[in-house]
């Protein structure tokens, strides 16, 4: 399943990929007048209330909503499964910086006693996996991985191992992010990681000699991994088989 800047489900996303649609545009989430970076890849026309009840949506930050939406878009029928044999490994590099920003503003203007009582469960990045588990009633592993840009791949690899080790038969795996906000844009700009090019068609050009950084984006992607015989037994449409997974680092530089 997918929630992306060029489509809020796999069908729309893939159609727009093939048509070469560009999801980058001017930042609409906050005033960028004082910022060098003024563009990002924002998700458009997303409504959590169409996917879950209002109360549940209200208790989730956007990155968690995206994760639930992408998991739902994956189209797996959980009702016929043992919930204790189904788990979730969905990561988020940041969680919700927006909640941190709001809390800081509240403390400054109204005092610490007025901070949102749901600040922590809306802020911490493991709530993406937690909310997917709650939404679908999955009672196996519920784990968050934080490895920056490698998070989603890391989650898929760890989900594979959970199945190989016999901890689960079905795993929802992927990544989610929604941090297009003043703090994130300012921070990544200070790191000189973001491009300052304002033309959306020339902003994200990683293999071009004129490249100058990446573009901040948001969205979620979730895949369903199954033990092979389990998938065959239920007549699943198998898109691919994962043969193995490994992880290393260069132990050299923070980026």
Where are these regions (language model features)?
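Active-site-adjacent elements of ketosynthase-type condensing enzymes
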Residues: 32-42, 95-99, 178-204, 222, ...
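Conserved beta-ketoacyl condensing-enzyme motif
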Residues: 12-14, 18-147, 176-185
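Structured loop/turn residues at beta-strand edges in well-structured enzyme cores
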Residues: 84, 166, 186, 236-240
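Active-site pocket-shaping loop/turn-to-helix segments
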Residues: 2-8, 54-72, 115-124, 142-157, ...
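Active-site-proximal alpha-helical scaffold in enzymes
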Residues: 67-77, 125-177, 215-236
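Condensing-enzyme catalytic core mediating Claisen C-C bond formation in acyl metabolism
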Residues: 18-25, 199-255
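Short glycine-aspartate micro-motif
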Residues: 85-89, 169-173, 204, 239
